[in-house]
């Protein structure tokens, strides 16, 4: 719907949907004017604007915020038969932290860092959503992180192939992360969000924001916001 509305104001040019590695990639593509619309996490938008964090000495510009969309929960998934019950149990395990240059990777690294879980303690790998689910199912990895709106499709689809559990972050970890990084909000994934999930899961979240190239007309941006909120 959004792409259809936007294309009406672009002199007959249609938008093409592109798959990317995630937030950081979208910000760079917007800044280089390769894409005209993209979604990114608020924490990465902040760093890209100020040239901090993952964008140290690499300030990006050329895009504007259109709307805050929804909370993206940092979700840690294991097989139901796994011995992993807490973050500390990841020691000595193989953990997928998402694709390179993605918001998931950044969030996972910060959670692990705040929990004292360095690369010397756990083995981290980079995989896309589809392959992380496949490798957890086949026991090639022990856990994966994914930052996304809840009722995440890839997680729910995985429940149809094997039993899984979501791991809660302990309150000490949540407090420490919130103190260090202002964009994180404490978040609860309600019981029964996923098949077989019988208890609430406690974690953190970041906001997802719709961005547009600065060259996109105000009229088009107005149509986009109306489509979202009217």
Model regions: which residues?
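Pocket-flanking alpha-helical
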Residues: 3-4, 16-57, 132-135, 151-158
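Extracytoplasmic
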Residues: 10-12, 22-25, 32, 60-63, ...
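Bilobed "Venus flytrap"/periplasmic-binding protein-like clamshell domains
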Residues: 1-17, 68-138
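Short amphipathic alpha-helical coupling segments at ligand-binding clamshell hinges
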Residues: 217-227
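Pocket-lining segment of extracytoplasmic ligand-binding domains
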Residues: 42, 52-53, 82, 118-211, ...
């Amino acid at each position: 719907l959004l792409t259809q509305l936007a294309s009406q104001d672009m002199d007959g040019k249609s938008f093409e949907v592109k798959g990317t590695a995630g937030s950081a990639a979208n910000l760079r593509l917007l800044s280089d004017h390769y894409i005209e619309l993209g979604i990114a996490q608020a924490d990465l938008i902040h760093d890209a604007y100020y040239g901090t964090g993952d964008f140290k000495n690499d300030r990006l510009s050329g895009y504007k915020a259109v709307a805050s969309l929804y909370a993206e929960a940092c979700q840690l998934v294991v097989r139901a038969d796994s011995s992993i019950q807490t973050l500390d149990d990841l020691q000595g395990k193989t953990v997928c932290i998402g694709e390179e240059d993605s918001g998931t990777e950044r969030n996972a690294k910060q959670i692990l860092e705040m929990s004292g879980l360095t690369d010397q303690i756990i083995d981290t790998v980079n995989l896309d959503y589809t392959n992380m689910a496949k490798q957890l199912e086949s026991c090639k990895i022990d856990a994966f992180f994914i930052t996304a709106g809840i009722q995440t499709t890839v997680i729910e689809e995985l429940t149809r192939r094997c039993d899984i559990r979501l791991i809660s972050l302990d309150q000490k970890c949540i407090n420490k992360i919130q103190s260090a990084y202002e964009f994180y909000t404490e978040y609860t994934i309600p019981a029964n969000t996923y098949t077989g999930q019988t208890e609430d899961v406690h974690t953190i979240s970041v906001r997802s924001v719709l961005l547009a190239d600065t060259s996109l007309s105000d009229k088009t941006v107005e149509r986009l916001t109306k489509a979202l909120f009217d």
